[in-house]
């Protein structure tokens, strides 16, 4: 289905240890995490909170297991803080990823975000940007995009539950007000369906701008409980709203077909944060790998 050597398969460490809730998977070590990724048949990983920041140490650990770094999350605060603060941290992050051989930097605006707040209802309190904030976001992303390209990288914007860029309309707004040469899009199946969006619409409309893909599934019965009981994003994660592709309600066949017939080259990263005490990360990594092999021929 996919052209040879166009797709690399990664998996996010958040299934082993959760950066937002460190108590989830606190017992799982960095070495266990990356060893199980490799054993499950993946080529790479994004970066978690237990990963060494020393690139020499990290490279050695990954090379022993034939793994690479696909990318790493970067929180921007372009709508709420001076640009200089974000830029200073971004340059360090960019240089780290450049040293690790990554080609994309995952960015997500966290100004006014509720994704990290345990007791704030997700669907009732989602932030909505003002026009001034949209302009600050676009200008800031253009600046970061140029900084990324100085080292041969691209920024990919991660639409995300509980943030100001979550819905179809918000993604469209962001794409409309940003330069496609500087700001690319991360396509995340799980966050789109969780929000009630139509992922194929976003995929088809912005295919040329998509430079990174997160494969994530959802358990609809848990999402329904999140809405009914007015739970937060973190409570949704703890209750099992997300799971690996093939274990939830999302249909991936057409997603894979569209991407296979496109010029997309890069990573597919399985990202499914759930409680590792309830969903064994290695078992679920194997499930995801088998599903991708079966459905995408990869």
From Swiss-Prot:
InterPro entries: IolE, IolE/MocC, IolE/XylAMocC-like, Xyl_isomerase-like_sf, Xyl_isomerase-like_TIM-brl. Keywords: Cobalt, Lyase, Manganese. Its cofactor is glutathione; Co(2+); Mn(2+). It catalyses: scyllo-inosose = 3D-3,5/4-trihydroxycyclohexane-1,2-dione + H2O. One of its GO terms (molecular function) is myo-inosose-2 dehydratase activity. Pathway: Polyol metabolism; myo-inositol degradation into acetyl-CoA; acetyl-CoA from myo-inositol: step 2/7. GO terms for biological process: inositol catabolic process. Gene3D superfamilies: Divalent-metal-dependent TIM barrel enzymes (3.20.20.150). Pfam families: AP_endonuc_2. It is an enzyme of class 4 (lyase). It comes from the Bacteria. Its EC number is 4.2.1.44. The keyword Transferase does not apply. Belongs to the IolE/MocC family. This is Inosose dehydratase. It comes from Bacillus thuringiensis (strain Al Hakam). The gene is iolE.
